[in-house]
Amino acid sequence: MFTLSDFDFNLPPELIAQTALPDRTASRLLEVDGSVAPARLVDRHFAELPSCIAPGDLLVFNDTKVLKARFFGQKASGGKIEVLIERVTGTHTALAQIRASKSPGAGTTLRLADAFDVTVGERVEPFFTLHFPAPCLDLIEQHGRLPLPPYIEHDADATDETRYQTVYASNPGAVAAPTAGLHFDQPLLDKLDAMGVERATLTLHVGAGTFQPVRVENIAEHKMHSEWYDLPQSLVDKIAATRARGGNVIAVGTTSMRALEAAARSADEAGRPLAATQAETDIFITPGYRFRVVDRLVTNFHLPKSTLLMLVSAFAGVETIRAAYRHAIEERYRFFSYGDAMLLTRRDTPEAPGA
């Protein structure tokens, strides 16, 4: 049984990428094949991705768009607050985290961005319901700030507003970017199209829980955050066609992976084939999990002791990921959201009995 300590590693702080590279495809790409032993590691650049995949393969992208979900404001008493929108729940309502010296009660009015007032509604642990005076997506876009991850040490600027979004983002609702997709630009997508690689999209709105640390040594006790996803019938059809022609299903990012595997696991449990799905998922993928859909994964380098490091370890193999991360640190790859990428091939068999 793996414990939290099994997913720890020492990362020199200077390897945490603080800014995006000028060219999206200039990032490095570590190709990792966990289906062979010892694992095969190849140093590349992301622009070489087309040479790593085949015509007839299917790339699955998450088209969520990051909201300008961060606000500073004050209570009627003058006390300062910080608000992070977690999820838009209706035209005029959202769930949010609120940092304040004292938690506001229901009925409290909060002034945000010195521009408009919201009213606090019921508590939905650990969030607060906020009622907006106008469509909240409009107010968020007009007055909010882009919420960069906690390990990025500068406030979001105009460059971040472009580079912390994928070029294909179209469905507003995330509070963090699906960062594997940040490496794709339109010329690369056009090149993949021209060589006969299929593309499809799903939506999973990434929540702030993606940065939530695991606080228990026994990882089986960890409570995973929940996120909403939409897997359309067009994607289901493309997966079936890819399987029929012997192609690989390649998830672009762990969010695409989690949506695909959540839908497939639910279908398995119901005794039916994969189908279009709109649902919440709190799927927690750890070593021993049996992957049902995804053959390969494009992903960034993840934080020590994180659920995402556990996910990639389940996919490619614990020792394979350890070797890959050691190599990446030795070769000075850039880590986390603005960092470099990996292309992982699935380990053939799970490492231990699992879901």
Curated annotation (Swiss-Prot):
UniProt superkingdom: Bacteria
GO cellular component: a single term: cytoplasm
Q: Name one GO molecular function term.
A: S-adenosylmethionine:tRNA ribosyltransferase-isomerase activity
Catalytic activities: 7-aminomethyl-7-carbaguanosine(34) in tRNA + S-adenosyl-L-methionine = epoxyqueuosine(34) in tRNA + adenine + L-methionine + 2 H(+)
Record keyword Transferase present: yes
Q: EC no.?
A: 2.4.99.17
User: Per the record's keyword annotation, is Membrane included, yes or no?
Assistant: no
Q: Which EC class heads this enzyme's classification?
A: transferase
Sorted alphabetically, the keyword list is:
Cytoplasm, Queuosine biosynthesis, S-adenosyl-L-methionine, Transferase
Localization in the cell:
Cytoplasm
Biological process terms from the Gene Ontology for this record are: queuosine biosynthetic process; tRNA wobble guanine modification
Its pathway is: tRNA modification; tRNA-queuosine biosynthesis
Q: What family does the entry list?
A: Belongs to the QueA family.
Q: How does it assemble?
A: Monomer.
Q: Which NCBIfam families match?
A: PRK00147.1, queA
Query: What is the documented function of this protein?
Result: Transfers and isomerizes the ribose moiety from AdoMet to the 7-aminomethyl group of 7-deazaguanine (preQ1-tRNA) to give epoxyqueuosine (oQ-tRNA).
Q: What is this protein called?
A: S-adenosylmethionine:tRNA ribosyltransferase-isomerase
Q: Which organism is it from?
A: Burkholderia cenocepacia (strain HI2424)
Query: Lineage of the source organism?
Result: Bacteria, Pseudomonadati, Pseudomonadota, Betaproteobacteria, Burkholderiales
The record's gene field reads queA
